[in-house]
A protein has these predicted regions:
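Alpha-helix C-terminal capping segments
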Residues: 29-30, 69, 81-85
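DNA major-groove recognition helices of helix-turn-helix
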Residues: 91-109
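Non-catalytic, well-ordered alpha-helical scaffold segments
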Residues: 48, 52, 66-67, 96
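Long, hydrophobic, amphipathic alpha-helical segments used as structural scaffolds
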Residues: 27, 65, 106-109
């Protein structure tokens, strides 16, 4: 998607943060509802599709991209985790590439 290539890094990060939040919120709700009406079933199916889209997008990334997406958006326990691995410029380049790749796969479904 050429549109993402021209998007600011800040905007890309915001999109990823929203997706990660939605992913964890939906995972937390998984299995907690009752299937007592069709509206609830539609909501559950929508949530399961969202979870699957996130997981599929992650699996499409190469190992370095997965490392960045995982550490920056899904398991943020280690601030500055990248400092021993990359220069700041290399990290910023890889982060942008990883986010764009993830979002391209996520939005193509």
């Amino acid at each position: 998607m050429e549109r993402l290539e021209k998007t600011s890094l800040k905007s890309l990060i915001n999109q990823m943060e929203l997706i990660a939040k939605g992913y964890f919120d939906d995972r937390k709700k998984r299995g907690t509802e009752f299937l007592n009406d069709s509206d609830n079933l539609i909501y559950i199916n929508h949530r399961e599709r969202f979870i699957k889209r996130v997981e599929n997008a992650y699996l499409e990334l190469d190992p370095l991209e997965q490392l960045v997406i995982n550490n920056d958006f899904f398991y943020e326990d280690y601030p500055n985790w990248w400092t021993d691995l990359f220069s700041k410029n290399s990290y910023q380049y890889l982060k942008r590439r990883a986010i764009i790749h993830f979002l391209n796969v996520f939005y193509e479904d």
